Amino acid sequence: MTEFTTLLQQGNAWFFIPSAILLGALHGLEPGHSKTMMAAFIIAIKGTIKQAVMLGLAATISHTAVVWLIAFGGMVISKRFTAQSAEPWLQLISAVIIISTAFWMFWRTWRGERNWLENMHGHDYEHHHHDHEHHHDHGHHHHHEHGEYQDAHARAHANDIKRRFDGREVTNWQILLFGLTGGLIPCPAAITVLLICIQLKALTLGATLVVSFSIGLALTLVTVGVGAAISVQQVAKRWSGFNTLAKRAPYFSSLLIGLVGVYMGVHGFMGIMR
């Protein structure tokens, strides 16, 4: 059976490193806690670029620490399953978990957009029904429906942040603490990197994948924080595709995770059949 470690010894490790960076970057773009909370926090406190960088790095550090703790635990447990016959079954089980995670991410994003659009249509219908004299511009309505999308949970966090910090002076320690606590939220992409690390059974490469994921996450979070400090509105005006990219990021992320799961599942199945 061709194991992941054998593939890495053959010089194929380059595939996993950029994939981990891409997963981290896509996770940072997904609508949810990190991006929405950071942008809301920076805007509410009227933060500087330096504070935005601090916030992004703090969230990345805490996120990396959580992944490290889980990864070390997984690697310790995986040492009990060193038999050659157990390896393909572990790969197959991991593949099922990864593919299920990808499907859940895709379905959650699709359902969230559907519910959001249905609520918008319902609101417009009720408004039109109660006020026949008021007319909406169709072009503006279309743009509003397909504008920036946020799930209700993330928007609630953003509103709460605005109420708590609007107009207040905050210290660097408070900014770091906010970033550290925000980065503790687990994500499906980090779970995928964890499962890959367990299958590789290589501490050095596992650490590299975790660091690569963190680099991608840091690039996105710092960029979003700096963009919020400069002005998110200006960025959206200058680049019309920014909102579309942010809204579609979960689909790309789930597709990439699904491909990783299929790859692992095929190798696990081939190992079982031999």
From Swiss-Prot:
Residues 34-56, 108-175, 231-251 are cytoplasmic. GO terms for cellular component: plasma membrane. It comes from the Bacteria. Gene3D superfamilies: Nitrogenase molybdenum iron protein domain (3.40.50.1980). Residues 127-153 are annotated as: Disordered. The keyword Flavoprotein does not apply. The chain crosses the membrane at residues 13-33, 57-77, 87-107, 176-196, 210-230, 252-272. GO terms for molecular function: nickel cation transmembrane transporter activity. Residues 1-12, 78-86, 197-209, 273-274 are periplasmic. One of its GO terms (biological process) is response to nickel cation. It is a multi-pass membrane protein. Signal peptide: none annotated. It is found in: Cell inner membrane. InterPro entries: Ni/Co_transpt_high_affinity, NiCoT_RcnA. Residues 129-144 have a biased composition (Basic residues). Keywords: Cell inner membrane, Cell membrane, Cobalt, Cobalt transport, Ion transport, Membrane, Nickel, Nickel transport, Transmembrane, Transmembrane helix, Transport. Induction: By nickel and cobalt. Transcriptionally repressed by RcnR. Probably also regulated by Fur. Cadmium, copper and zinc have no effect on the transcription. NCBIfam families: PRK10019.1. Efflux system for nickel and cobalt. Belongs to the NiCoT transporter (TC 2.A.52) family. RcnA subfamily. This is Nickel/cobalt efflux system RcnA. It comes from Escherichia coli (strain K12). The gene is rcnA.
